[in-house]
Amino acid sequence: MKPAEFMGFLHILENMKCNTRHSWTHTGRHESVAEHTFRVCCMAFLLEREFPELDMNRVLKMCLIHDWGEAVTGDIPSFLKTGGDEARELDAIHALTAKLPDREAELNALYAEMEARETPEAKFYKALDRLEAVIQHNEAPMST
């Protein structure tokens, strides 16, 4: 990967720091997509020894990339997300992976596995994604 491609891709992902989610932090501010992703990854890492049968490297990759599309589309809460929103997010994901030709096939296969949720790793990643959101909602003040 050329340095300019690397930096350009990181610049797109930087949007995850700026794009906020529906949830709030315990300090009363909106959580960013990047903060959510960080904690989902931490959860997978911390639970690695509890689930030795899982390929945790694969789970961590899923956790790390699962919201990359939101760097382009922004976060749409699951209770508001439509089929059209999901299609736009998938288009954004494919546009992003196309910027990484050396990793495009690997990333698209990983996204397909995540969407199908048939493997133990994909099910575990999705459970962590949902669990993190529940934990965050419970940590936020009731007034938010």
Say what each PLM segment does:
Residues 1-144:
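Active-site helical microenvironments for divalent-metal-assisted chemistry
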